[in-house]
Curated annotation (Swiss-Prot):
It comes from Mannheimia succiniciproducens (strain KCTC 0769BP / MBEL55E). GO terms for molecular function: ATP binding; metal ion binding; ribosomal S6-glutamic acid ligase activity. Mg(2+) 2 binds at E266, N268. Its EC number is 6.3.2.-. Mn(2+) 2 binds at E266, N268. SUPFAM superfamilies: Glutathione synthetase ATP-binding domain-like. GO terms for cellular component: cytoplasm. This is Probable alpha-L-glutamate ligase. Binds 2 magnesium or manganese ions per subunit.
Length: 299
């Protein structure tokens, strides 16, 4: 089969692992930058055409693919999801589908979807730009977490120790036209969370992440430490439910333990493979390609 991966950085561990695994399974895989696409809607069939601009040379019409794996970063979400939508319109299976991918990339909309599915999440508020910052901050506890809507890898997440600081940060971001969420800080978790890697209807791998001393974020890209963990049945169930609530085939679901019980922090539609594979010792890439093969076959 001929597969396509949408990714700006083909040398990343996850991209290299998936390409190698796909090729070992007898498939061909192209890795293309979504920002180098031109999308065309035309009268004659096929109505959806895609052109690609290589680093050198002239643009060319892309062939049809058997399936596509989106691995683009947050800065490419708009164009990446447009490319995905174009491919989906040609009935090409996407792992994940464009609507679910876009939903997961928006922290507020994804939290709304989780809450609508009766999945517990931290207390969170999202205020319009004309809503008074002080009144918004009063609706959550202090210390307060502030998050931009589209950050990743811990970027765009701020901890305000005092309410006054939260107000000041919120006002500054609002003035810069940067939408921000306010969220309860789960201090009892001790800067630790659980990353669950979900494929289909099961958790295939998991790890516990802990932030460095003095760091409230547990993300690996912020220097977090990982270790193996055995999940309870409840943790597995919540992780799968969270992925399904967003309509994702593949997801990285982040869980955190609070005084009120287990909460879902967020759901990642393009979770990294490097730390989860190295920590758990599980070959996640092979399971992703196997799942994609079944999806293509309609199983």
């Amino acid at each position: 089969m001929k597969l396509l991966m949408l990714c700006r950085e083909p040398n990343l561990y996850s991209c290299r692992r998936l390409k190698m695994t796909a090729e070992n399974a007898g498939h061909k895989m192209d890795i293309l930058d979504p920002n180098r696409f031109l999308l065309k809607i035309q009268e004659n069939r096929p109505h959806f055409a895609l052109y690609y601009q290589p680093n050198q040379g002239t643009p060319y019409l892309l062939p049809d693919y058997d399936a596509v794996i989106p691995r683009f970063g947050t800065q490419s979400t708009k164009m990446g999801c447009s490319v995905l939508t174009h491919l989906a319109a040609k009935n090409i299976p996407c792992l994940n589908n464009p609507a679910s991918f876009a939903l997961a990339r928006d922290k507020w909309l994804s939290l709304q979807a989780l809450a609508a599915a009766n999945i517990a999440v931290p207390v969170t508020v999202f205020a319009g730009q004309d809503f008074q910052a002080g009144s918004a901050v009063e609706k959550v506890s202090s210390p307060t977490i502030l998050k931009t809507l589209n950050g990743s890898q811990g970027i765009g997440v701020i901890l305000a120790d005092r309410s006054q600081s939260a107000v000041s940060i919120m006002e500054t971001l609002t003035l810069s036209h940067i939408p921000v969420l306010l969220q309860d800080f789960i201090g009892e978790a001790g800067a630790s969370d659980i990353r669950c890697f979900v494929i289909g209807d099961k958790v295939v791998a998991a790890m516990q992440r802990s932030g460095q001393k003095g760091e409230f974020r547990a993300n690996c890209h912020r220097g977090g430490i990982t270790q193996q963990i055995t999940l309870s049945d409840d943790e597995k169930l919540i992780a799968v439910r969270a992925a399904q609530a967003l309509g994702l085939d593949v997801a990285g679901v982040d869980l955190i333990q609070s005084k009120k019980g287990l909460l879902v922090l967020e759901v990642n539609a393009s979770p990294g493979l490097e730390m989860i594979e190295k920590t758990s010792g599980i070959d996640v890439a092979t399971q992703m390609i196997a799942y994609l093969e079944k999806k293509i076959a309609g199983l």
